[in-house]
Amino acid sequence: MSHCTTFAEAGRLVDAGRRAPFLLTLCEEDENELHITICCAKAEPNAQTPSTGNAALDDTLAHCTPLSPDENAKIELIFENYLLYQVRNESYCVFDADEVRSGTYLCTFERSQLLDYLPRAIDVHLIPDGTDAPASRKHYGIYTQNQIIDIVAPSEPTRHLRISYA
């Protein structure tokens, strides 16, 4: 099954699983067209955790469930004309309380350091709609198990968002 939805609806779908998704692919297919495929995380309920030799750690791990990619629940996002994107190692990212975002794993930002930095990184006067107004661009964040992907684009990947369940 496959259907199109909005970035916010896809975010609610991922949020419902209460686990960060996994990044499967990130590539540029056509000129300035960014393709990102993520999949939901699934618990491995019968996984055995080996003993570490540390009783306190073993007790903690006994209450944990390993996660793995659920390739039956994929989300493909295609940004047709991005302005900037970056991939960060999630282990080294910091939370900025001054940023204004909505969403948990698929986020949109009203205010962010990346949006503030944008005029220093690109010529904002060349943005496709001909304006350098902040409303002409949006910051999207994709928070996966191991990466934080930030995309600034003039429009969201609405009609190119595909959710498939095998």
Model region roles, listed by residue range:
Residues 1-166:
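Surface-exposed, interaction-prone regions used to assemble/regulate multi-protein complexes
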